[in-house]
Amino acid sequence: MGIESLCSADASEPFWDWNLTWHTENPDFTQCFQNTVLVWVPCIYLWVCFPAYFLYLRSHDRGYIQMSILNKAKTALGLILWIVCWADLFYSFWERSQNIFRAPFFLISPTVLGITMLLATFLIQHERLKGVQSSGVMMIFWLISLLCATVIFRSKIMLALNTDTEVDAFRYVTFCTYFILLLVQLILSCFPEKPPLFSEAVNDPKPCPEFSASFLSRITFWWITGLMIQGHRRPLEAKDLWSLNKEDTSEEIVPGLAKNWAKEWAKTKRQPLNMLYSSKKQQKSSDSNGEVMEEAEALIIKPSQRSSEASLSKVLYKTFGPYFLMSFLFKAAHDLLMFTGPEILKLLINFVNNKSAPNWQGYFYTGLLFVCACLQTLILHQYFHICFVTGMRLKTAIVGVIYRKALVITNSARKTSTVGEIVNLMSVDAQRFMDLATYINMIWSAPLQVILALYLLWRNLGPSVLAGVAVMILLVPINAVMAMKTKTYQVAQMKSKDNRIKLMNEILNGIKVLKLYAWELAFREKVLEIRQKELKVLKKSAYLAAMGTFTWVCAPFLVALSTFAVYVKVNKNNILDAQKAFVSLALFNILRFPLNILPMVISSIVEASVSLKRLRVFLSHEELDPDSIIRGPITNAEGSIVVKNATFSWSKTDPPSLNSINFTVPEGSLIAVVGQVGCGKSSLLSALLGEMDKKEGYVVVKGSIAYVPQQAWIQNATLEDNIIFGREMNESRYKRVIEACALLPDLEILPMGDRTEIGEKGVNLSGGQKQRVSLARAVYCNADTYLFDDPLSAVDAHVGKHIFEKVIGPKGILKNKTRVLVTHAVNYLPQMDTILVMTDGEISEMGSYQELLKQDGAFAEFLRTYANAEQSMESSDASSPSGKEGKPVENGVLVNDATGKLMHRQLSNSSTYSRETGKSQHQSSTAELQKPLAEKNSWKLTEADTAKTGRVKATVYWEYMKAIGLYISFLSVFLFMCNHIASLASNYWLSLWTDDPVVNGTQQYTNVRLGVYGALGISQGIAVFGYSMAVSIGGIFASRHLHLDLLHNVLRSPMSFFERTPSGNLVSRFSKEIDTIDSTIPPIIKMFMGSTFNVIGACIIILLATPIAAVVIPPLGLVYLLVQRFYVATSRQLKRLESVSRSPVYSHFNETLLGVSVIRAFEEQKRFIKQNDMKVDENQKAYYPSIVANRWLAVRLEFVGNCIVLFAALFAVIARNKLSPGLIGLSVSYSLQITAYLNWLVRMTSDLETNIVAVERVKEYAEMEKEAEWSIEETAPASTWPQEGKVEFRGFGLRYREDLDLVLKNINITINGGEKVGIVGRTGAGKSSLTLGLFRINEAAEGEIIIDGINIAKIGLHDLRFKITIIPQDPILFSGSLRMNLDPFDQHSDEDIWRSLELAHLKNFVSSLPDKLNHECSEGGENLSVGQRQLVCLARALLRKSKILVLDEATAAVDLETDNLIQSTIKSQFEECTVLTIAHRLNTIMDYTRVLVLDRGEVVECDSPDNLLQAKGLFYSMAKDSGLA
């Protein structure tokens, strides 16, 4: 009974009839089935989808779409369909009234269908109101409805044609109308609606076409075709890329992860905080950082006392879980569809064996196989698309959170996480999560596939499968051990990588010092030592990987062998026929994928777990307590800065650096902080900024703060951007600031005035200019409180005096502001309201200048000792407004070739910054300020990372092969071939075995068949192990070779290269590109080779079985190649654009880490976070189209593969009477795999081409111009050279590039051995150029320099630079021991080093350190004061004992006492030596033998100081300006 009662009033009509539907040459469904199931299926689909879809639309409102003709048409058709359905219903009621009783379905089906059509019409309108431009749910509904209606339509036509029965005319007409309306609805649903009103896409100049694309376009990724065509016609550029979808932007993604992490972090510290001011913390946390953007709030506000570990994995799951759920559903559907192939193959082989089966069944199976394969393709690539987008979002979120965290971690945390480590977190670790997102579902999917495959195998072969299962179980512990080991190696490798990147960062930051000292080789060895450890671990990983590949490639074969062996041996009557063998083989092939992918997934999870831990450790670092310093408006009148009983240390565990600090600064007063080197002056400012850990006490700083650090921090932006620093432009204030900070003459030097882009870290500015830009930034921001950390040290005293008068002093711009000035310049002290004297981290004295003199304490003694020095501060090189004024013109010249000639304008004498000439400069520089922005881009002094275009050249592959070694390369290919030949032979042998005749219920020769099958398998395994080892070892050879080349080429590059190239580009080469060469390219090569041979093998088998396939395979192959070439052009360029847009992310991040204290002081975190987000989004703008392009290609190529499946099955059906079941089984089972092979081959081809770009980018630097040879044996001078120290300049001229004017010309001067020569000159005179020429940092354009009779151009650079010593302006130290910083080549004994430290006045300090000479200097030497670093540089010079010493403003950053010590040391220890000093303070060279006066690149005067003063020339005017004449 049951459903039969619906079919007719008396239940006489059947619901299903096998004879009508299956066992016939002309199949059809029963009337009842047609009018129930085929009508209800689409209705059930829509009603099942409705609740979830309705809720989805409610939560995803994109704004409503206006009624369009398309929407009106769809709505009208929906209503007509409802009318047609209910016309049928009313007709049935009318029939009943006429006593014609039809089956119940004539009433039920039109009712259900009518209501469903009303629901569909409602959804059409609801989708419009919610902004859905193209609906997948509705399109699938119309498609299912049409397919079901097509079956009924065919049946009705056949009924009308084949029988004499009377046709129900009314129902015939209504059904035809219904069918046509469905067809029109389906066609209309293929077209998208207009964008919703007020949608962002309307205002976006380059919106991503994805959301406006139709459903059909989205599932086939047709919407990216426009970009693919564009990329095929010409190389893509950044401007061709679309904007990022809103839900993929940092603005949308990062806040979610940041908030969830903050909540998780808060949970781990439930216990009350044992802090002095915990109650105040709670009340302040809401408003103390009101400025900080919302998503950063959680990270910036929370203090960081941890009680237990927060779980980052839980947070990531909470944030990205919903995306993974979507991918879970798609993956589950795909996995189930995957097993339809073997099941249909089983039916197909049965069909071939059953000669009486009707032909249509074969075609039906073929069609079904094709449809299932196409569905599988569409679902698989939607799954992949979701995974990749999730991975992209995951990376965006992680990078965003790391950046936000980096802005708030404490200084002690910064020491544990160096710049290199944090950059690695952003590049390598974030990438690991991105990769994991693709594979994460395999954790459950692989076991599911294995279980389903084993179940179907059990059905096919029975208990014999248990033998295969046993083999698999045996392999599990082997792989578990390998996974554990891999994790250990992974941790070790990452540690080495961090150390290497950290060291490279330092090398790149201090490259000028390395070149001047000729230390490149020592540091190259240090890098290679770390690299050697890294490669050692990589080699161990490679052996493991080879073992892993061996076990996993052999696993399916071993499973098959053991299963078949047990099956045929257990019972002689078990026949291995084609159906059993090839269905099992198809299942084993399915089994191969999860078994092959599992190790990849495990290693990906292992890598991600290592990264997860590193990331969690970083995100759990202590953060600065925003409430340790009370900021903001203060009602009481105590003062602008109030510090009571405050004790500070650099970290919670360190002893206090500042003890019992008590002072109050009245509003608007000027305070000086003085003291010896390393007494805690800079620490005091850091404490007021909240950069130190407050142990106890109370600190209030009123209003906003502006901070000028001792070492100026300059951004890679225009001069104007550096000064405005994110604030609004106020022309009049800006001009006032420029003038007050003595920057007007510099604007004349710079080609585009303040619009000139200055290089990274301001490399193209002198120390003095950098300091003045840093000062101008602070002055412009108009803060309430100003903290100056010795800003006058890097500028000449004359300029310092101007700045003090115009800016800092009682009559300066800031006269009404509160100012705290750390200074070594005692001549300004009488003008101070209060002076704080620091001694060993405490305030030893405090009061006005007069009060302190009266106290007759340490301060008075200090002043008496240095009374002369005070006077000498007035006497200085007044010739220039900055400390190192040769440099602006000289390095400013590093500009684009076309416009370079225009730039080189030397300054006239009027450039001297003085009251008399101020007016004329102001006018000329105002014009500079107003130069049009249109020219801005032509004056960038640094070069952005550029993307190459076109195909990756074959030479790049050849270079990589050579790096591997040609022998290993060819051996690998040979072993790959052996492996695949053995694989094909074993399967062909199996097909012959299955075709063996059955005699008396058994097959003969079973033992032989089994033995040969096993032998082929073993030879396959040996070849697999061989090629795995060869590729892995070859990859390591290539890694070593390419890294060595890159390192050598970068170190050999001239200084101009580093001034043009942002360090982010170089760091990217050493981190991301080398990581790609280390870890990504070798496995890709392995998979590429494997896929290539798999495709070739499958085609050979199909052609052997059905030679007619030769008609189809070549054209399909041609389509395949065309589509692939079409794709690769775009994909390759997108990868390059992604690489290029990645560098600015690192550069900006590096820049932020270096200037984090300035950013925090100015409270600019919000703006910098936004900038970082924009740079990350720019990077993802190139990455997103590349992942879509991958899917676009895969869908098209899998369709080609599905066509091969279709034709292989079709030809097998056509030729079923001629072919053996074994061959058909072999052919179809291989064709089933070809789709996956093709897909994998293209992915690997594309991956190989896109990743080989890393080799291309590394090799790029091999072609750069190089410096001269480091050493030339033939011309190497004697080890005792130079004995005399005589330096002759003969007609010497110098230019910075071939197309530029000379900056030094016709220099003819002889400096005798032992002479002390001062070099002075006005701005741009060429003082620094002379030293750069002497060290051959820039080569001579004309003339020559002779030292002790040897032309320095003829000898090696190291031979020269080792023999001359310089004490540079910027004292740079490297992380490592103090001993390494003094003697990196380990050439000197401890006695020598201690003696040099004693002479440099550092012996007491170093002796007091726990580790003495092994004291670890932090990155950049940050754990020593600038003065102490300068003394270390002096100790280096003393240690080298060279005959020629060059001083480049070496005493700019030290106090007067230290300056005096340095000068006396130089006089005593270098008495016999030739000393060249670029004079910073004229008084220091007044006792020199001679003074060399340069002007406009020429020597204008050269004589003893006394004679020059009497001559009343240029030197006299400079001395007069300084008060020395």
From Swiss-Prot:
Keyword Transmembrane (UniProt): yes
EC number: 7.6.2.2, 7.6.2.3
Compositionally biased region (Polar residues): 871-882, 908-928
Gene3D superfamilies linked to this entry: ABC transporter type 1, transmembrane domain, P-loop containing nucleotide triphosphate hydrolases
UniProt-annotated location(s): Cell membrane
Membrane topology value: Multi-pass membrane protein
Any one of the GO BP annotations: xenobiotic transport
Chief localisation class: membrane
Residue sites binding ATP 2 per the record: 1321-1328
Cellular component GO terms held in the UniProt record: basolateral plasma membrane
Catalytic activity: ATP + H2O + xenobioticSide 1 = ADP + phosphate + xenobioticSide 2; an S-substituted glutathione(in) + ATP + H2O = an S-substituted glutathione(out) + ADP + phosphate + H(+); sphing-4-enine 1-phosphate(in) + ATP + H2O = sphing-4-enine 1-phosphate(out) + ADP + phosphate + H(+); leukotriene C4(in) + ATP + H2O = leukotriene C4(out) + ADP + phosphate + H(+)
Assigned keywords, A-Z: ATP-binding, Cell membrane, Hydrolase, Lipid transport, Membrane, Nucleotide-binding, Repeat, Translocase, Transmembrane, Transmembrane helix, Transport
Annotated TM spans: 34-54, 75-95, 101-121, 134-154, 173-193, 316-336, 363-383, 440-460, 464-484, 547-567, 590-610, 962-982, 1020-1040, 1084-1104, 1106-1126, 1198-1218, 1221-1241
Binding-site list for ATP 1: 675-682
Residue span of region Disordered: 871-891, 908-930
Keyword Flavoprotein: no
Enzyme class: translocase
Domain of life: Eukaryota
Occurrences of domain ABC transporter (ranges): 641-865, 1289-1521
A GO molecular-function annotation: ATP hydrolysis activity
Residues exposed to the Cytoplasmic side: 55-74, 122-133, 194-315, 384-439, 485-546, 611-961, 1041-1083, 1127-1197, 1242-1525
Ranges for domain ABC transmembrane type-1: 324-607, 969-1250
UniProt xrefs under PANTHER family: ATP-BINDING CASSETTE SUB-FAMILY C, MULTIDRUG RESISTANCE-ASSOCIATED PROTEIN 1
Protein role: Mediates export of organic anions and drugs from the cytoplasm. Mediates ATP-dependent transport of glutathione and glutathione conjugates, leukotriene C4, estradiol-17-beta-o-glucuronide and other xenobiotics. Hydrolyzes ATP with low efficiency. Mediates ATP-dependent, GSH-independent cyclic GMP-AMP (cGAMP) export. Thus, by limiting intracellular cGAMP concentrations negatively regulates the cGAS-STING pathway.
Family (UniProt): Belongs to the ABC transporter superfamily. ABCC family. Conjugate transporter (TC 3.A.1.208) subfamily.
Protein name: Multidrug resistance-associated protein 1
Species of the source: Gallus gallus (Chicken)
